[in-house]
Amino acid sequence: MLVDLDQPGETAAWLGGTAISIKADIARNEGWAHVAEEVDRTFGRADIVVNNAGIYPRALIDDLDFDLWRKTLAVNLDAHFLSAKHFVPRMRKNSWGRFVNISSNAIGMSVDGLSHYMASKMGVIGFVRGLANDVGPYGITVNAILPAITNTPGTRGVSDEDKKAFWQLQAIKRLAEPEDIVGPVAFLTSDDAQFMTGQAVVVDGGLYKVS
């Protein structure tokens, strides 16, 4: 089930496949309550949650007001907490569950105008590690993926020049595509990764290795 605030149907079509899409605000508790109800009604159980929503508004500290700070943390971090509040109890009933939370390799970089974004994505790592301890006894794993900047609708606002500045630092000299991230996500949701939890998996074309 694909959840989006704006046009989930368009995103589902862009991704392809047979995804069911619903509209909800994942930065609010009410949004996740709606998602959980729809999952119960449609599937009868919840096994896997991938927290992939995020915003990337750039602003230097002089231009960064509290509203933008809070909006960034609400979408990029609060949503991960809310997903756990609604779906951990459902997964616990089945003694099995997988959370994959998307952070960013930007947390290890120095980039102007992204202090709020980096704070939110670093927070994801801390939350993943803490939650993994809480839910591990119930057969639930929690991991994070730190991707490079990726060619998705969410990065359309990033200039080609800025994108190139990132990927030129990588060992693999190109922009990441969604397909590059799908494989690691699928692995972390599988039984093959049942002994991995609380981990931050970097999928960034080798940027950390060479910088």
Model-predicted regions and their roles:
Residues 84, 120, 128:
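Active-site helix of classical SDR
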Residues 89, 133-134, 194:
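Alpha-helical segment proximal to the catalytic Tyr-Lys
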Residues 109, 186, 197-211:
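Short C-terminal tail/terminal secondary-structure segment
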Residues 136, 141, 196-198:
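Short, small/polar-rich loop/turn modules that mediate ligand/substrate recognition or access, typified
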Residues 170-181, 192:
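A conserved structural motif in NAD(P)-dependent oxidoreductases
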